[in-house]
Amino acid sequence: MRTKIAIPMGDPAGVGPEIVVKTAVSKEILDLCDLVVIGDKKVLEKATKICQVDLKIHTIKNIEEGKYEKGILNVIDLENVDMNTLEYGQVQGMCGKAAFEYIKKCVELAMEYKVDAIATTPINKESLRAGNVNYIGHTEILGDLSNSRDPLTMFEVDNMRVFFLTRHMSLRKACDAITKERVLEYIERCTKALKQLGVTGKMAVAGLNPHSGEHGLFGNEEVKEITPAIEEAQKLGYDVVGPIGADSVFHQALQGRYVAVLSLYHDQGHIATKTYDFERTIAITLDMPFLRTSVDHGTAFDIAGKGIVSAISMIEAVKLAAKYAPNFKNIK
C-alpha cells in the first residue's frame, strides 16, 4: 500500500492552494505517494486555472473514496470559503478560520491512522487572529490538538538535520536560556525524535561563542553550561559530541560526520540550512503521535493569485514526509 500524505490547503488567500495543485502534478510526487487535500474545492479549482495545470478536483468524504491516479486530486471539501468575498493577498478572518479547520481535520485523520503523515502549507498569523483562532502558528495548533506538550522542530536539507535549543526569543534571552539542564534535556529529546524517524548515530552540539569560547577566553557558556551537559549525556549513554564551533559543525554534518546538530538559537540553525539551500530546507515537527513536515515559507500575499509561486518547497516537504513515514514510530 502506498504512503498517504494529508495536506491542509492553508490560507485560501495565500499561495497554499497554488503550491498544492502544482505539487499534485509533479512526477516526483506521482511516483512516490498518494495525496489527500483537506480544503475547499472551489478555491482549488480556481488555483488550477491560475496555475494552468491539468488537474481534476475529486471530492471525497473519506480516504477510502479516493481515486489515486494521475490527473486527479482527492479533496475532502469543507466548503468553508465564500468565493464572492475571497480576496487574494488580504488578511481575512474567514480564511484564518478555514485554515485552522483544514489543520484540525488533518490531525483527526493522522490520529486515526487514516493517513501516514501531514505536509502543511502556509497559514497567516493575522488571519488566524481575525478568525478568532487563538494560536500563533502550526506547531502550537498541532501540539494542542494532539495533546503533545512541546513539539520539537527539526530542519532538514540533504545530509544536514538541525534542532533548536531556543527559537522565538531575543538573542539576549536565548543566551540566558542556555543552561546545563536545558542542553541535557534537548540532547535527550532530540535523540528520541531521531529514533521516531528511524535515525541513529552521533549528534553534535554547536558552540555559542567564537571557536566555542576558547576555554573561556571568549565567553564562559561552553565551560559552565554546554560542556558539562554533553559530558553528563555521554555518561548516560547518549552518542553526542561538542561543543563544536558553529562555523564548522554544519559543514561537518553535511559531510556525514553527524546525523544531526543541536543549534543553540534560532538564526544559528536557520542561516546554516537556508544559506545552503533556501527552497529545499524543510521543517519537520517531532515528539508528536504523527509525522508533520512543512514548507518553510509564508503565505506570500504579495504574489498570491498570480500563479508564479514556486512549488519546490512543497514538493520537498511531501518527499520528506514520504521518506520518513514508513519507519515513523510514536515513541512516548
Curated annotation (Swiss-Prot):
Residues noted as binding a divalent metal cation in the record, renumbered to the chain: H168, H211, H266
Pfam families: PdxA
Protein name per the record: Putative D-threonate 4-phosphate dehydrogenase
Function: Catalyzes the NAD-dependent oxidation and subsequent decarboxylation of D-threonate 4-phosphate to produce dihydroxyacetone phosphate (DHAP).
Keywords attached to this entry: Carbohydrate metabolism, Metal-binding, NAD, Oxidoreductase
Reactions accelerated catalytically: 4-O-phospho-D-threonate + NAD(+) = dihydroxyacetone phosphate + CO2 + NADH
Similarity comment text for this entry: Belongs to the PdxA family. PdxA2 subfamily.
Oxidoreductase keyword on record: yes
Cofactor: a divalent metal cation
InterPro entries: PdxA_fam
Subunit structure: Homodimer.
Gene Ontology molecular-function annotations: metal ion binding; NAD binding; oxidoreductase activity
Cofactor note: Binds 1 divalent metal cation per subunit.
Residues holding substrate: H138, T139, K274, R292
EC number: 1.1.1.408
Keyword Oxidoreductase: yes
